[in-house]
């Protein structure tokens, strides 16, 4: 399912998905319309914009994750947004988004994120305040390790825009993505 308030983006993403041989594509112009569609149909993957009115991508994600319909709750959500600030990335991740892409989106990057949620799905967890993909991306560290890391690392200012590879590292640190593979030499090296 493609959810975006821009008819152009819906058409563009739909065309890219059809190029990937996806045939059953539904479209919605905001989160409320998408939820209505999902009453009768459960998407395999949701491509979602952030800023839409009256119901934005974060509200939609929270609604899906808190749904009492089992299958629907587990649908992978890939947020596609023109915003790349650190606070937004964290906000989307904490709402239950599986992956995050920054516009403009290339077919290669979209394919990479779709492939990531299919080939490397994260287990879902439930806490008192969260249901969604496990946000723990690394081994759990001790308090002493965390304090040392905090001294060694310079935090990213919340308003600073991030590059797509930095966003990928937040969602999947230490893993290699299919789109990263293209940067490596292929075939015999001389």
Describe every region a protein language model picked out:
Residues 7-26:
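Two-component/phosphorelay signaling modules centered on CheY-like receiver
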Residues 14, 59, 73, 84-99, ...:
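Alpha4 helix (beta4-alpha4-beta5 surface) of REC/receiver domains from two-component response regulators
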Residues 27-36, 57:
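Helix N-cap/capping motif at the beta->alpha junctions
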Residues 41-47:
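Active-site beta3 strand of CheY-like receiver
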Residues 53-54, 85, 103:
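The feature encodes the CheY-like receiver
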Residues 105-118, 122, 126-127:
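C-terminal output helix
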Residues 119-189:
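CheY-like receiver
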